[in-house]
A protein has these predicted regions:
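Basic/aromatic-rich interaction segments and small domains that mediate binding to polyanionic partners
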Residues: 3, 7-66
Length: 66
């Protein structure tokens, strides 16, 4: 199991990491909450503040240390 995966928990607040801001510039300034973690994939399901539907992002695209 990846060590970074251990630090990401459901309910954790997050913002995009540096690589996430480069890859997803439209989401660069948004913050949200982790709603699900894929244990078999690299996908993390997140809900951005103000959004109605969740989004799946690669775990390297988010950082939970606000």
């Amino acid at each position: 199991m990846d060590l970074k995966m251990d630090r990401i928990a459901v309910g954790a607040r997050f913002k995009l990491s540096e690589i996430g801001r480069i890859r997803c510039p439209d989401l660069a300034d948004k913050v949200g909450v982790v709603v699900a973690i894929g244990h078999r994939t690299t996908g993390i399901t997140v809900l951005f503040d103000g959004a109605q539907r969740p989004t799946v992002l690669h775990r390297d695209y988010i950082k939970t240390n606000l």
